[in-house]
């Protein structure tokens, strides 16, 4: 829950001076990106902006305290303030902030600006007491905010010092409105107005001006002088002389003498006790001070002018002026040291009663009350964990003695999940092992099962599927049906283990079960994970259309639950890119991979390895080797500076080896082959992929026999495990081996198998990537005219893709080629005497490339009847009677010109 007072603009008080000259300056605030109000404490920053904000509707107010250095808390309140200003316009951002479903503050702000693009009215966001922010991540995020905020949004920041928000750049670009302490200082006229409002007997203008000069227009000093004069302890001028030259850091003695010592003991204790509250209402005051009618007491303190501020329009919430509040808290530590723990305990209890456990934890920590802290955590820790209050939980758990954790194993489990969320896998197992060693009877029952579920998740994350399987099974055997979260975890892990072992049908069933349980209990990140795993399994089985449909369900879940900024979103768009690439939708595949990189923009560059490999695959499929080389340089740099899972390495190696194949770089392939990992098994898609990389390198090096052994074993495994997509890939590589080894009939046999299997997988780019060798074979198959209709159609599509992206055979019949051909001494006399037109040469090239008449018409964007005319003319000029003879004639010309065909 959010504390309402932190989102309420302060109420404009009676007897305050309206700062007309400053309000006039602020009237143009909508022309600036940032309005910055800076001064030491007590110069009236908040009062000024509350006057300016009066009557404005499109304004959000966020009052900071020390706890707002937690990024998640800062995000929640800031988005809530924007929602306040826009009447709930930014619903997606609000949900993301509430559920902590964003990768970083900057990515959350980026989503905010997308939603605000449809908000066209002027909009203001006030952040008060920004000097309390010390978290550099928040500073950096707010710099991003200011750089990218919409033109109709003005950010208003109040701070005691110059914040780290790129002020100089804004100033140079005239996008900054500044008001500092010199402008905030009261003028003679304002001081006179102030005293006239506060004192029953007016003072002379000259006297008022001298007092104002003595304290340099400092508003707090003027307020203290008025308070002293009302209490008749000193004349106003005497108080002014005493305050002259001092500042906020030297006020303590003065405040003791002039404020605390001039109120009765009951009021003094009320002030000291209530000051421990960062914000307060009737219930909190009654519980903390022990006085009845807390609201009435607060209003009385306000009337006495004791630096109390209303925080909302209802008058329910109050807080002390920061300067006075800090002073009172220091005095409380000195004067009520013995009572202070009990006061904090009372505050914690009252905050708990009002449903604010995070505020209660703050006071339990201050009280040093481990028992209270333990009880709060036992009741609310998992809710705080699910809302990503990780820093607060970590601080709280560190404050508990180890014995207290042992007595409450749920808290040990919580601490372990905290470590897991931070990828501290080794520490998780150490902590759980220590707890099991020291907690009696923990090695059986529900808690042990929950430990095992977490251990199973750690094991699979750490690349240990056998241990993960053992632990997940133990957990599922021991967990009661109602322990849904740990059951979801264990079921998911077991499904992932079976995926790794190639038991795809069983794995798919478990992932579907995980999805069902996760949806039932609103555990959305596991629901998304299970859908991604289902898609991968279906892809591996060769059911790419069903994999696509499963991905659509995952995208829908992301949109409905606002999961766009979870790292898992990158996983989803990456496997979508792989599917699009397989179907030769290269532009879409590239866009999808780039969106994955964008999701990970706030993470370490190493996390982008897989998407970068996908971009390289797109370049390779297009035959764009220059771009591929540039991207490969970055990929190889990332490989050398990180630790990766085996499937990540396999995907990275794949594009490297294909590039070496395309460029004939045998030295690089040989060097890689000497050092690369050779897995013990090949029972899943990423191990199959690594062995396929090895076989491709061996083929490039002419090591056909060992490559054939590898590929035959891969095919045996793929058939037995129904890894149909891998089988399709293996057949294509085996085809290349046979072709290069001169075993043309074997090459044709496995190519026919690959084409038939592609009717199920839909593969296109896997054929295209093999380039000219594939094009030659497909042309021959098409010319034989024996392919079934589906395979014939696919072969023609693959040829078109090869021709488009790799500039193969028909590209040789361009103007430069024809000119060189006609000047060749061995050119047939018939072509010299009756030369083809440029269009007829193009048609000949497309006939040679395997295109049908309809496809040639589509490629050249002319009518089919026109193509028939061109074909009739070129047959006559070449002296041939049919298509097969034209293909053979073109082949002779290419050989004559030195092209290996």
UniProtKB/Swiss-Prot annotation:
GO BP terms: positive regulation of carbohydrate metabolic process; positive regulation of DNA-templated transcription
Q: Which residues bind DNA?
A: 853-872
Report residues binding ATP.
39-46
Entries under CDD domains matching the protein: LuxR_C_like
A Pfam family of this chain: GerE
Q: Which GO terms describe its molecular function?
A: ATP binding; DNA binding; DNA-binding transcription factor activity
What InterPro entries does UniProt report for this protein, alphabetically? Answer: P-loop_NTPase, Sig_transdc_resp-reg_C-effctor, TPR-like_helical_dom_sf, TPR_MalT, Tscrpt_reg_HTH_MalT, Tscrpt_reg_LuxR_C, WH-like_DNA-bd_sf
Q: Which UniProt keywords apply?
A: Activator, ATP-binding, Carbohydrate metabolism, DNA-binding, Nucleotide-binding, Transcription, Transcription regulation
Instruction: Give the activity regulation note.
Output: Activated by ATP and maltotriose, which are both required for DNA binding.
Q: Where is the HTH luxR-type domain?
A: 829-894
Which superkingdom heads the taxonomic lineage of this protein's source? Bacteria
Q: How does it assemble?
A: Monomer in solution. Oligomerizes to an active state in the presence of the positive effectors ATP and maltotriose.
Provide the function of this protein: Positively regulates the transcription of the maltose regulon whose gene products are responsible for uptake and catabolism of malto-oligosaccharides. Specifically binds to the promoter region of its target genes, recognizing a short DNA motif called the MalT box.
According to its UniProt record, which protein family does this protein belong to? Belongs to the MalT family.
The protein depicted here goes by the name HTH-type transcriptional regulator MalT
- Gene name on record? malT
């Amino acid at each position: 829950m959010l504390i309402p007072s932190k989102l309420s603009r302060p109420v404009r008080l009676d007897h305050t001076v309206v700062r007309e000259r400053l309000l006039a300056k602020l009237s143009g605030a909508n022309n600036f990106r940032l309005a910055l109000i800076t001064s030491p404490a007590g110069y009236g920053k908040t009062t000024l902006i509350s006057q300016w904000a009066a009557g404005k509707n499109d304004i959000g107010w966020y009052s900071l305290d020390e706890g707002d250095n937690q990024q998640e808390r800062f995000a929640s309140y800031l988005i809530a303030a924007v929602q306040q200003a826009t009447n709930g316009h930014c619903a997606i951002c609000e949900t993301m902030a509430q559920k902590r479903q964003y990768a970083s503050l900057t990515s959350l702000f980026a989503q905010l600006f997308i939603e605000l693009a449809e908000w066209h009215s002027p909009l203001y966001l006030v952040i008060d007491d920004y000097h309390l922010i010390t978290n550099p991540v928040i500073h950096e995020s707010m710099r991003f905010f200011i750089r990218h905020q919409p033109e109709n949004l003005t950010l208003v920041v109040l701070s005691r010092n110059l914040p780290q928000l790129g002020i100089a750049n804004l100033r140079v670009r005239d996008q900054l409105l500044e008001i500092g302490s010199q402008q905030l200082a009261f003028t003679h006229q304002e001081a006179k107005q102030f005293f006239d409002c506060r004192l029953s007997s007016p003072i002379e203008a000259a006297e008022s001006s001298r007092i104002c000069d003595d304290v340099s227009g400092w508003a707090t000093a003027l307020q203290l002088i008025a308070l002293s004069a009302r209490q008749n302890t000193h004349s106003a001028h005497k108080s002014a002389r005493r305050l002259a030259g001092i500042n906020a850091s030297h006020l303590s003695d003065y405040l003791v003498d002039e404020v605390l010592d001039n109120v009765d003991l009951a009021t003094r204790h009320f002030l000291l006790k209530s000051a421990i509250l960062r914000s307060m209402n009737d219930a909190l005051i009654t519980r903390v001070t022990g006085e009845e009618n807390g609201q009435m007491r607060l209003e009385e303190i306000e009337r006495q002018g004791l630096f109390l501020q209303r925080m909302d329009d209802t008058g329910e919430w109050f807080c002390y002026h920061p300067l006075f509040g800090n002073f009172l808290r220091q005095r409380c530590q000195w004067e009520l040291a013995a009572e202070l723990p009990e006061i904090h305990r009372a505050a914690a209890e009252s905050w708990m009663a009002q449903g604010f456990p995070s505020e209660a934890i703050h006071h339990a920590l201050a009280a040093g009350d481990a028992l209270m802290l333990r009880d709060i955590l036992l009741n609310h820790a998992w809710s705080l964990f699910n809302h990503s209050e990780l820093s607060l939980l970590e601080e709280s758990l560190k404050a508990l003695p180890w014995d207290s954790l042992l007595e409450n194993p749920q808290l040990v489990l919580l601490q372990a999940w905290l470590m897991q969320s931070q990828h501290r896998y080794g520490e998780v197992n150490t902590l759980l092992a220590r707890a099991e060693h020291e907690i009696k009877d923990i090695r059986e029952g529900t808690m042990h099962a929950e430990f095992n579920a977490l251990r199973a998740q750690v094991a699979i994350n750490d690349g240990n599927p056998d241990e993960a399987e053992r632990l997940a099974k133990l957990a599922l055997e021991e967990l009661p049906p109602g322990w849904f979260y740990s059951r979801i975890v264990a079921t998911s892990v077991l499904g992932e283990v079976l995926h790794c072992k190639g038991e795809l049908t069983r794995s798919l069933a478990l992932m579907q079960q995980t999805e069902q349980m996760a949806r039932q209990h609103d555990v959305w990140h596991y629901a998304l994970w299970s859908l991604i795993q289902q898609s991968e399994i279906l892809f591996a089985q060769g059911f790419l259309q069903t994999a696509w449909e499963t991905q659509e369900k995952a995208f829908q879940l992301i949109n409905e639950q606002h999961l766009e900024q979870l790292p898992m979103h990158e996983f989803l768009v990456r496997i979508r890119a792989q599917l699009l690439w397989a179907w030769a939708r290269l532009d879409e595949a590239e866009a999808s991979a780039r969106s994955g990189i964008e999701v990970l923009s706030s993470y370490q560059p190493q996390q982008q390895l897989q998407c970068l490999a996908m971009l390289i695959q797109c370049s390779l499929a297009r035959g764009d080797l220059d771009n591929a080389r540039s991207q490969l340089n970055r990929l190889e740099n990332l490989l050398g500076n990180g630790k990766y899972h085996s499937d990540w390495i396999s995907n990275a190696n794949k594009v490297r080896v294909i590039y070496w194949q395309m460029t004939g770089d045998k030295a690089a392939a040989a060097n890689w082959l000497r050092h690369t990992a050779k897995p013990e098994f090949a029972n899943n898609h990423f191990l199959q992929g690594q062995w396929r990389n090895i076989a491709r390198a061996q083929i490039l090096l002419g090591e056909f026999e060992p490559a054939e052994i590898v590929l035959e074993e891969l095919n045996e495994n793929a058939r037995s495990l129904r890894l149909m997509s891998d089988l399709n890939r293996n057949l294509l590589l085996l085809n290349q081996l046979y072709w290069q080894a001169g075993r043309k009939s074997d090459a044709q046999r496995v190519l026919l198998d690959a084409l038939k299997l592609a009717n199920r997988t839909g593969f296109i780019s896997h054929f295209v990537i093999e380039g000219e060798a594939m094009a030659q074979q497909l042309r021959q198959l098409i010319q034989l005219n024996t392919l079934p209709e589906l395979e014939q159609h696919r072969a023609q599509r693959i040829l078109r893709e090869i021709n488009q992206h790799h500039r193969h055979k028909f590209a040789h019949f361009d103007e430069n080629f024809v000119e060189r051909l006609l000047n060749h001494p061995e050119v047939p006399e018939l072509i010299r005497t009756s030369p083809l037109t440029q269009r007829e040469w193009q048609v000949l090239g497309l006939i040679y490339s395997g295109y049908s008449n309809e496809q040639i018409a589509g490629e050249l964007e002319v009518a089919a009847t026109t193509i028939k005319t061109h074909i009739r003319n070129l047959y006559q000029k070449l002296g041939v009677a049919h298509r097969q003879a034209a293909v053979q004639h073109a082949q002779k010309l290419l050989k004559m010109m030195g092209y290996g065909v």
